[in-house]
């Protein structure tokens, strides 16, 4: 049985958040990036979070947001963790009085050990597929063999995961956590409770 943590990202509806919690997800993610079909506004996110039970980590995903924009969101939405998915420097990620993770889009020549050292203040590193011009949420997977063993940061594996491949991903990569969005959707922004349950079952059984 796996004790790998899980995050269901791209939540836009309360029923989807509650389905994720019911299935056993450790965290749910809200996308604060207007170009994403899964984007939410502060009122949506705050209303959903207000209905969550305790011990569910709420994560805000940002792509090159200004410090002013991010602070305005944090004044309204009680997020536990920040996820930076753009070209942010370590300095861009600091100073919000919350733990944060940095997403990296993996390419064959990337030095992931060096990236972990570069983002020394991160609580973890999220590894996603590289698709030119798209910061994430593509539904594409990548070659997991590109991930070195024993990276210096907890690894959150993302990119094209679903109930069909997450168990193999866990066996191969041995991540701290897995992150899914498109793999548990009816359509972009709308989750499928049965797919969430199947995904979480596969995670537990890995």
Swiss-Prot record:
This is N-(5'-phosphoribosyl)anthranilate isomerase. HAMAP family: PRAI. The keyword Metal-binding does not apply. One of its GO terms (molecular function) is phosphoribosylanthranilate isomerase activity. InterPro entries: Aldolase_TIM, PRAI_dom, RibuloseP-bd_barrel, TrpF_fam. Belongs to the TrpF family. It comes from the Bacteria. It comes from Pseudomonas entomophila (strain L48). SUPFAM superfamilies: Ribulose-phoshate binding barrel. NCBIfam families: PRK01222.1-4, PRK01222.1-6. Its EC number is 5.3.1.24. It catalyses: N-(5-phospho-beta-D-ribosyl)anthranilate = 1-(2-carboxyphenylamino)-1-deoxy-D-ribulose 5-phosphate. Keywords: Amino-acid biosynthesis, Aromatic amino acid biosynthesis, Isomerase, Tryptophan biosynthesis. Pathway: Amino-acid biosynthesis; L-tryptophan biosynthesis; L-tryptophan from chorismate: step 3/5. One of its GO terms (biological process) is L-tryptophan biosynthetic process. The gene is trpF. Pfam families: PRAI (PF00697).
């Amino acid at each position: 049985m796996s004790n790998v943590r899980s995050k269901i990202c791209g939540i836009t509806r309360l029923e989807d958040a509650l389905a994720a919690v019911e299935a056993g997800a450790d965290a749910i993610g809200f996308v604060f990036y207007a170009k994403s079909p899964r984007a939410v506004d502060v009122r949506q996110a705050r209303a959903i979070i207000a209905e969550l039970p305790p011990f569910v980590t709420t994560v805000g995903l940002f792509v090159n947001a200004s410090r002013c924009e991010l602070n305005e969101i944090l004044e309204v939405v009680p997020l536990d963790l920040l996820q930076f998915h753009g070209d942010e420097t370590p300095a861009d990620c600091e100073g919000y009085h919350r733990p944060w993770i940095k997403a990296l889009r993996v390419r064959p020549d990337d030095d992931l050990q060096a990236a972990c050292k570069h983002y020394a203040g991160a609580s973890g590193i999220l590894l996603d597929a590289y698709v030119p011009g798209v910061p994430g949420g593509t539904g594409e997977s990548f070659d997991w063999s590109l991930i070195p063993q024993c990276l210096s940061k907890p690894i959150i594996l993302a990119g094209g995961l679903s109930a069909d491949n997450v168990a193999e991903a866990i066996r191969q990569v041995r991540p701290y956590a897995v992150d899914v969005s498109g793999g548990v959707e009816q359509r972009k922004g709308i989750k499928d409770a049965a797919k969430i349950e199947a995904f979480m079952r596969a995670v537990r059984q890995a």
